[in-house]
Amino acid sequence: MAEEADTNIEIWKIKKLIKGLESARGNGTSMISLIMPPRDQVSRVTKMLGDEYGTASNIKSRVNRQSVLSAITSAQQRLKLYNKVPTNGLVLYTGTIVNDDGKEKKVTFDFEPFRPINASLYLCDNKFHTEALNELLESDDKFGFIVMDGNGTLFGTLSGNTREVLHKFTVDLPKKHGRGGQSALRFARLRMEKRHNYVRKTAELATQFYINPATSQPNVSGLILAGSADFKTELSQSELFDPRLQAKILNVVDVSYGGENGFNQAIELSAEILSNVKFIQEKKLIGKYFEEISQDTGKYVFGVEDTLKALEMGAIETLIVWENLDINRYELKNSTTGEMVVKHFGKDQESDTSNFHDSETNAELEVQEKMPLLEWFANEYKRFGCTLEFVTNKSQEGSQFCRGFGGIGGMLRYQLDMRTFDELSDTEVYEDSD
């Protein structure tokens, strides 16, 4: 789960970068987009940039020529920092862009993607080309399928459009016995025993295939149980079935066949649910958060200030934030004392100048650094030992979380009464000032 959450954060960072790059514009063709796939050679690209520099020297327009040469030089300098292409490839954007107020500004972004990028690109244009980055945003969710009927069971996975059969086995179950008499009970008992053993074997193999032994967590985002008879239902309700996998069941579907044909049919019947899996996970996550609140367990926080206090204490296990939270984190310096303070403001608070003055001395608070709080969370959350989950406001639960709880909150590792914590910090301040 934590690994999945980390991937979602990386995807969010790439989305944010793409948005920024797509909106950037330059004069002439002074913006370079360069993508090197894994196992590409830095020397090849360095040579190509050298050739490009020679060609660009012949551009007639002096202004454009200087911009292009400057961008190529910048790319060459940045490449010198790499002796070889990183494991997942290398992405580099550099050039001179025009700000909203018409001023020119040099920018350079270079990074190793969080998963391999299978694209090779070099373009000099009046905009950055980000199309190739979209493949990084594609979901690599993997789903497990258990297709179980009276003849045997198949275990498979589906990731994107790739389906894989992990294992299948057949079973020979006795049919219902038609003869009466004493033996009927014995046959029924034997039949039930064989059924039970069949369900147990399937449950054990499911744990073997779908639980990662290193992390003791499921290695799939969700499970689909399929089959013709009622075995699939029996399995899903059986206490032999691993509870970690039980929590991952997305759907139980009826299929007309067993084996591979049943696997294909189960994929078709589950298409809609699989495409909504992020939505379902979000509903579950926020549902669990609301449960903590309704049961008043004391293991939850909401609102910017309380959430950040709990985060600093290391109390938050899961930090939940709306993906469009419009709050900035300010590092401010008191112009009189030189003391640094951190404050968090929304749009309305930013336009109120009193927020940038010390409430007691009225000294000006000078902005040292301003950063979207979302971005700060994405960069820093691992430091606090929590998982970070970005949610939308598209589900009913998500919408309620954004409207009612300010779009930020967390589930805690242990009980924490924020009111007593506030009172404590107030008395501490009072004692200090004595």
UniProtKB/Swiss-Prot annotation:
Keywords: Acetylation, Cytoplasm, Growth regulation, Protein biosynthesis. It comes from the Eukaryota. NCBIfam families: aRF1_eRF1 (TIGR03676). Pfam families: eRF1_1, eRF1_2, eRF1_3. This is Eukaryotic peptide chain release factor subunit 1-2. It comes from Arabidopsis thaliana. It is found in: Cytoplasm. The modification N-acetylalanine is found at residue 2. Directs the termination of nascent peptide synthesis (translation) in response to the termination codons UAA, UAG and UGA. Modulates plant growth and development. SMART domains: eRF1_1. GO terms for cellular component: cytoplasm; extracellular region. Belongs to the eukaryotic release factor 1 family. InterPro entries: eFR1_2_sf (IPR042226), eRF1_1_Pelota (IPR005140), eRF1_1_sf (IPR024049), eRF1_2 (IPR005141), eRF1_3 (IPR005142), Peptide_chain-rel_eRF1/aRF1 (IPR004403), Ribosomal_eL30-like_sf (IPR029064). Heterodimer of two subunits, one of which binds GTP. One of its GO terms (molecular function) is translation release factor activity. One of its GO terms (biological process) is translational termination.
